[in-house]
Swiss-Prot record:
The keyword Transmembrane does not apply. This is Ribonuclease HII. Manganese or magnesium. Binds 1 divalent metal ion per monomer in the absence of substrate. May bind a second metal ion after substrate binding. One of its GO terms (biological process) is mismatch repair. Its cofactor is Mn(2+); Mg(2+). PROSITE patterns: RNASE_H_2. It comes from the Bacteria. Its main location: cytoplasm. Disulfide bonds: none annotated.
Amino acid sequence: MKLGIDENYFELEENLLKEGYRFICGVDEAGRGPLAGPVFAAAVIMDREIIIEGVRDSKKLTPKKREKLFEEIVKESITYSVAMVDNKTIDEININNATFLAMKNAIEALELVPDIVLVDGYEIPDLNLPQKALIKGDRKSYSIACASILAKVSRDRFITQISSLYPVYKFEKHKGYGTKEHIRLILEYGPCEIHRKSFLKNILR
């Protein structure tokens, strides 16, 4: 069943299916840029018979719409997984390596081994699976767009949940991103244990 979505948005997956790939996995991250908290990644293999209406790049959706789509994607997926890498590891291995690690962990936690992985951005090093990297892939691939929503909602929920542990920073409002208010609070109170120290060098110097 296809529900009101541009056909070219699923064209990549359709072509891969014709080439014989059965389990097509979309992978995306959330939280590369924030000053605090973990980076998340999601991997998902969607049912090719069901296209969920309204799936797009998660950054272009309202939080309410993302939450609704999250539940639909979870329900209609063949298998999905979400992984995170914490701020301390980000500081140790850098954000690029941390993002790739989260992506690999998410893929490896799937209940099925993908035939091919579609990844937003750049190829994942040492993946040992066929993969295709797409710049701005969440705008070009339905599977990546679904993964984008899973990663974004999962991270937002996590940050909102732990915000009560650090109330002065108001993480529930900015989700760790470098807003003017967040930077002001860092300068006033100093960083807390979930801040990425490697991201604060220019702010705290």
